[in-house]
Each structure stands twice: as structure tokens, then as C-alpha cells.
Swiss-Prot record:
Protein name (database record): Protein phosphatase 1H
A cellular component term, taken from the record's GO annotations: cytoplasm
Organism: Xenopus tropicalis (Western clawed frog)
Keywords: Cytoplasm, Hydrolase, Nucleus, Protein phosphatase
Reaction(s) catalysed (UniProt annotation): O-phospho-L-seryl-[protein] + H2O = L-seryl-[protein] + phosphate; O-phospho-L-threonyl-[protein] + H2O = L-threonyl-[protein] + phosphate
CDD domains given in the database record: PP2Cc
UniProt lineage: Eukaryota, Metazoa, Chordata, Craniata, Vertebrata
Location in the cell: Nucleus; Cytoplasm
Alphabetical list of SMART domains matching this protein: PP2Cc
Cleaved signal peptide residues: none
Length: 510
């Protein structure tokens, strides 16, 4: 066992820091791919340009050719890795999706309005749809980043399909979302209640008196003896996003028997709907809002360290998932055989602190979570704990599947654009971990703020140039000792993808 796991550690940790080619998947390569590999459609690259962009030595930074081809004058830039993988395994998509109301039968997204092709996206001045169209449905804006590992297959599939899964969750709740004056009904078809209502209950005493609302009373809804939760409208959108992530992951699982869908991916998306931004994250990409010179975090990273207790608890409840080769307990270092019977510091799923325990034979097994920081791995294999795909991922040279420990559930945070006025310099920055591995939030704040301050506020290219500047700062300059950034620090050798989304455009749409 030790030799096998040691082999996994050596092959994985030695040279592939972010975990890409070192992951062991068993998906059949003789199957056709679901979607051909490409770069984001909105970049408008020719096949020759895509080939030239894959230069691991020069690492050219790609930006939008036409700024008006993304909503809200959104800026975007990307760069390939320094040789970690053949392709840039990041993927990005941006859509404006119109969803029809459900009427009798299941409705589906309007194919023409869902912007499947990049050229159909409206520019920043043409986002508002006709009133008669909005009566029949609802429109949402969508930005997404997918950071692939062990191949770009899952990232490509998710970039093509996730927004459709979101749209499929919306038809049933369109009228409810539009009517913010009343609470969402507990059951569809019930009469909605005003949000100013003090209670959604009927006391037993009132029922026995035959008052308004009692059984037989002509004026009232059905009797309820128990308090009902008041569900905010935004929770319906959060639930729709959570279900869309789940369905996307299940779809990848189903289709991998028909198509070759390599690896897995993290997913960071933003949905603008009815005046609010919904940021959903599953993985280690990051989103921050820069407003009035301040940072508002809009996501959390999900790694073996941040999700240690969840992973340990699952292993505690289902020890068979460990294949009799791993221990769910954490120790400050690997336990040695000579330490059996001694007292050593340890940490279990129920603990944030540490305690001492007597070392047993079982503690000699390899730890479920191995390494620290960016080197932390689940079963010495993968460094992210949430995302899409990875259904075939196994521990090296074993039959132990890692997918049971990985979750597709995103964390969703909400930002109400209507509650704030925004200047031309207030932005939402989305980026894959290639940026955040080398730049702190404060460095991104300083870079974006200073760059935009020196740009014409009316220049629509300013956000693309700001995204390009961030990528350049994270990639650095190639020197004798590799890619270097400010203060001669090591630059990012990972794929880097960045959106810079101006928030004042959201106020205009609202």
C-alpha cells in the first residue's frame, strides 16, 4: 500500500503543482469527444490563431478583438500555462439567455435568444429586450469560468451546457420571481401571500371558533396548524443554480459512456437576474467586487484544507471509501511504525483544535488529506474538492474512486446591485486560480483601481485592458529563472483567465 501511494505522491507532486496530467482517469479515449476543443467563442479566434495561442514559451495574452461583443462592456483576457499541460484547460463562456414561461407543457430556453453563438450576443447598449417578450419570460446574463484538470473535456462540456441547465430550472418560477410583493407559495398553484403578512398560520383556537380561515369559511386558504418558513425570492434563484450544477454533473456522468469527457473542472459563474448578481462557485477560482476602493469577497475556495472536516466526516461514516489504505485522521506528519503506542497530536472530523491520542496500527495508513496549502491533496491525488466531472478519477494504481469525496454543490452569494450606486471604476473581478495563486486580493484591488483611474471613463476598452493588465501581472516576464513578477517573485505557470465586469452597467439595466 505504502509503495502505491508513495508512487502517486511522487508522480503527482513532482512537477504538476496544480494537478492536471498527473490525475489518473480511466474514461475511454477511443470514444468521440462531446465537443471539440477550442477557445471561448467570443474571442473569435481562427484555428491558426488558436494554435499560435498555445505557445508555452511566449505565452501570448489573448484579449477581446471587439469589446462590444460582451455585455456591459465586460473585459476578458487569458493566457496559457508554461507547459503544465498541452492545452489551456481553462474555459470561459458568456451568454444572454431568454427563458419562456412555462405554459401547460415544459418550456425550454429560447434557442435564438440563448446566444449559443458569440455573434448573437448584444452589445452593452442593446441588452434590453422588447416589453412584449419580457411578458412571456425572463432574461438573465451569464458569465462563467471553468478550470479544467486532467484534460479540458469536462470544462469544454460545462462551458457549452451549464447555462442551458440553469435555464431549465427557471420556467416554473418566472411569475413568482417577477412578483416581489408576494411571498413564494409553498406549493405551486396556491394563492400567494403578501410579503407584509405577519403570519402564514392559523391557530387551532381560531379554527374551532369558525373564524375567517377556519374550515368551511368561504374566504380563506386551507387550514394550517404549523408555522411555514417564509422563503425569500432570491432563495429560488439560489436553488435553481444549485440544481443546475447537480444536473450538469449528472449529465457528464451519463454521457461519459457515450463520449470521451476527460477530467474534471472547477466552476465559477455569475448570473444577473432582476437587479441582483448571483455568484456560484465550486472549486478554487475566486470572485471579488471592487467598490469605492474596497474589496467585497464574493466566493470561497474549496480545497482539501478548507473542507477537511466534511471529508473526514464522510470517511468516518463510510470507511469503505478509503479502501483500507487511508486513515481519515489528521496528524502533524506521517506516523512512523516506531511510534505505535506513543501519544501523538491528531485531529478528527469534530475538531478544529488538536489533542493527543495513542497511536495504533491503523494510524500508519496514508492520510486522507496530505500536504499543506496549494500542495494539499485528497488521497494524494487532487487539490480541489468541489467541481464537475472526475467520475472516473481513481487513486494511482488502485481501484479506489475519489469522486465520492468531491462535491458539485456550489456556494452561492448574492449582491443586490439596486441597493448601491456604482461608478465606472466599480467592478466584479472573476479569475481562475492561476491569478490568485500569485496575487493577493489587495494587489488586484491596487492594480485595477490604479489602471482604471488612468483610463477615460467613457472608453469601452478600459475593462478589457484592465483584465489584460491583471493577466500580465500574474504571468510576469520570462527570465533566466523562469517567469517572474514584481519583487522578483515566481510568476504563475498555470492557465490564467480573467473577467472584469463593470457594475454601473447593472444599474442601467436595473
Amino acid at each position: 500500500m505504502f509503495t502505491r501511494v508513495k508512487s502517486a505522491v511522487v508522480s503527482f507532486m513532482g512537477g504538476i503543482m496544480a494537478g492536471s496530467s498527473g490525475l489518473e482517469h480511466v474514461n475511454g479515449s477511443d470514444l468521440p469527444v462531446r465537443f471539440s476543443y477550442t477557445r471561448p467563442e467570443f474571442l473569435g479566434l481562427s484555428p491558426d490563431e488558436i494554435e499560435c495561442s498555445a505557445d508555452h514559451i511566449a505565452r501570448p495574452i489573448l484579449i477581446l478583438k471587439e469589446t462590444q461583443r460582451l455585455p456591459w462592456s465586460t473585459g476578458y483576457a487569458e493566457v496559457i500555462n508554461a507547459g503544465k499541460s498541452t492545452h489551456n484547460e481553462d474555459q470561459a463562456s458568456c451568454e444572454v439567455v431568454f427563458v419562456k414561461k412555462k405554459s401547460g407543457v415544459q418550456s425550454t430556453p429560447n434557442k435564438n435568444s440563448s446566444s449559443k453563438r458569440r455573434s448573437s450576443l448584444p452589445n452593452a447598449e442593446g441588452l434590453q429586450l422588447k416589453d412584449n417578450q419580457e411578458v412571456d419570460g425572463i432574461t438573465f446574463h451569464y458569465w462563467a469560468l471553468f478550470d479544467g484538470h486532467a484534460g479540458a473535456g469536462a470544462a469544454v462540456v460545462a462551458s457549452k451546457l451549464l447555462h442551458h441547465h440553469i435555464a431549465e430550472q427557471i420556467p416554473d418560477i418566472i411569475d413568482i420571481l417577477k412578483n416581489s410583493a408576494v411571498l413564494p407559495p409553498t406549493c405551486l398553484g396556491e394563492e400567494p401571500e403578501s410579503t407584509s403578512s405577519n403570519s402564514r398560520t392559523l391557530t387551532r383556537a381560531a379554527s374551532l371558533r369558525g373564524g375567517s380561515g377556519a374550515p368551511g369559511s368561504p374566504s380563506t386558504p386551507p387550514t394550517r396548524f404549523f408555522t411555514e418558513k417564509k422563503i425569500p425570492h432570491e432563495c429560488l434563484v439560489i436553488g435553481a443554480l444549485e440544481n443546475a450544477f447537480k444536473e450538469m454533473d449528472l449529465r457528464i456522468e451519463r454521457e461519459r459512456s457515450t463520449y470521451s469527457i476527460s477530467g474534471g473542472c472547477t466552476a465559477l459563474i455569475v448570473v444577473y437576474l432582476l437587479g441582483k448578481l448571483y455568484v456560484a462557485n465550486a472549486g478554487d477560482s475566486r470572485a471579488i467586487i471592487i467598490r469605492n476602493g474596497e474589496i467585497i469577497p464574493m466566493s470561497s475556495e474549496f480545497t482539501p484544507e478548507t473542507e477537511r472536516q466534511r471529508l473526514q466526516y464522510l470517511a468516518f461514516l463510510q470507511p469503505h471509501l478509503l479502501g483500507n489504505e487511508f486513515t481519515h485522521l489528521e496528524f502533524p506528519r506521517r506516523v512512523q511504525r516506531k511510534e505505535v503506542g506513543k501519544m501523538m497530536l491528531y485531529r478528527d472530523f469534530n475538531m478544529t483544535g488538536w489533542a493527543y491520542k495513542t497511536i495504533e496500527e491503523n494510524d500508519l495508513k496514508f492520510p486522507l488529506i496530505y500536504g499543506e496549502g496549494k500542495k494539499a491533496r485528497v488521497m494524494a491525488t487532487i487539490g480541489v474538492t468541489r467541481g464537475l466531472g472526475d467520475h472516473d478519477l481513481k487513486v494511482h494504481d488502485s481501484n479506489i474512486y475519489i469522486k465520492p469525496f468531491l462535491s458539485s454543490v456550489p456556494e452561492v452569494r448574492v449582491y443586490d446591485l439596486v441597493q448601491h450606486e456604482h461608478s465606472a471604476d466599480d467592478v466584479l473581478v472573476l479569475a481562475t486560480d492561476g491569478l490568485w495563486d500569485v496575487l493577493f486580493n489587495e494587489e488586484v484591488l491596487e492594480a485595477v483601481t490604479s489602471f482604471l483611474a488612468n483610463c477615460d471613463p467613457d472608453d469601452p476598452h478600459r475593462y478589457t485592458l484592465a483584465a489584460q493588465d491583471l493577466v500580465m501581472r500574474a504571468r510576469g516576464v520570462l527570465k533566466d529563472r523562469g517567469w517572474r513578477i514584481s519583487n522578483d517573485r515566481l510568476g504563475s505557470g498555470d492557465d490564467i483567465s480573467v473577467y472584469v465586469i463593470p457594475l454601473e452597467h447593472g444599474n442601467r439595466v436595473s
